Amino acid sequence: ELVQKFVTSAKVAKEAGFSGVQIHAAHGYLISQFLSPHDNRRTDKYGGSLENRMRFLKEIYLGMREELGKDFTIGIKINSTDFKEDGLTEEDSLKTIIELANLGLDFVEISGGTYERPAMMGATSKSTNQVFFAEYSKKLKQKIEIPVVVTGGIRSINAMNTLLNDNTTDFIGIARPLTI
């Protein structure tokens, strides 16, 4: 029933004229909690192994794809890690993204942390001057062919150009720099 509510929401977006949706599977919200072994203590088919923990997200994605067709863009925002002890690891995050990319996902936006443990409050990456998830994005881009969006800590045009020119990411997600 809950999966169908996500599918219906995406259908409403399409009917309203949007060309795509992004499934928010990051930051400790519901889908992120299913993915994280720290939060997901279920003993049914939605808990335990990574395959089981990603089942909810896969069912949402596949339901949307079936309902909306191949021409409707569907992406996800997902944590590289949730920075919790016994939480979602980079390895599990990579496996989840690869699985979804193989199912036809259109793009992935990389983020990290939860509102309990916000990654974007921490130190910035020295190798890219400001960006929080650049190293993870580089690893990911070697494993998938769909576009990758990096967000978090990107504050300057120089950093943006570096990320794009060295093939760290395909797109840059910015919010705070546009509002401050």
Question: Over which residues does each language-model region extend?
Answer:
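Flavin-dependent oxidoreductase catalytic cores
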Residues: 1-180
